[in-house]
Amino acid sequence: LDMEIPALSSFSSGVNLDTLPASEIETRLRDFFSGRIANPKPDELIQSVEQLEQQYGRYKEFQFAKAAALVQACDFAGARAILLDLVKQMPSDSRVLHRLAIADLNMGAAHEAQDVYLSALAAAPKSENLRREFAGLLRVMEAKKLYVGIDRKKHGLAAVCAIKNEGDDLLEWLHFHRLVGFDHFYLYDNGSTDNTRAVIESFPWPEMITYHFVEGEFGQMRAFSHAIDTYRNCAEWCAFIDADEYLFPTQAGNIKDVLAELGPAPAVAVHWLNFGSNGHEARPAGLCIESFTRRAPDDFPDHFIMKSIVRPDTIVSYLHPHQSLVLGCYVQEDGTPVFPIGGRCTAPKRSKLVINHFYTKSREQLLKKRERGRPLADGDPEKIRAMEFFTLRDRNDVEDATIQRFLPELKKLIQG
């Protein structure tokens, strides 16, 4: 994520910008800030745009780039001021209007965002993203009016998880997350053929599980979207996680104790730690959290990836398996505002909450995982990943037993 900003001289390459159309300037600006990482440091972007303005003049494209960087830096008021000025110059530019709506949403300004979405849709009536986000915002606003003063939430903290052939470790996963504070599990089974159903039925608290068996082209995105649409008013918080992810508090006894410190925040970014195989060829006899104790180093690229704990009644649109667009601003575990991009944050924090991502497990389990594919719809060309993707993540550099403070109680629960 420490992407270097190129030299300013590389931006214009000797061309007079006044002779270029706006689209070409925009392309050059995008190339100037290009990189494989989606979220370079926003303060560096802001500084570089200001330097470009000083050297080349006040182009609208520079202003838009600066507003985008201010959004990444969570200076939504600063971004909004620039975008409002751009709207005066380009009242029918749906790109500018959309960015303004995003700034308003992050400020919690629902009515302002509603008005901007209407203008954006007038400029781009066929945009599926705009239509979906506008409809989601209306649902959030209507629910807030409909249920004012009424608490219909049955659960404090629920997990939403898409599963397939996870019978080996699912019982441990359920017991573990109940132990750290989860009240309910919304499980979407995408056509399991192993003992997954029997494992779920063996869980001693069946009332804690809502189970959906779906087949074919259902996939994770549709599962999570269904959960949001169906259960958005049933839980105070929902964590959207996978069956190989163990979310827990590093110090507190209960995740809800950490969430209580965050006040009315609508969404929390919780970061991965990626664990390797510990050299196991076959599935070990012990529990997952006691068998896989070695992980990648802190600066491993996947450790910038986050998952979300969200107040589901604030979700405007489900953007990505790792994040949602919400009414309000994401925060880190300590309440620091953050604007994730593509499920990543530049400065991950893990002193209070963390996700141990047991991605590879043993080689035997890794091969099974690759065979069943990603939680995507059948026929998706991205469903089966190359073997190299897995082997690159089998990192065992650091011994980390933080999660094992829950091990004695977890064993008691599993053993009955």
Question: PLM features: residue spans?
Answer:
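A conserved acidic beta->alpha catalytic loop
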Residues: 189-199, 205, 216
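Register position in tetratricopeptide repeats
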Residues: 38, 72, 106-107, 136, ...
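Residue-level recognition of tetratricopeptide repeat
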Residues: 34, 68, 102-105, 136
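Catalytic-site signature of metal-activated, phosphate-bearing donor transferases
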Residues: 222-225, 249-416
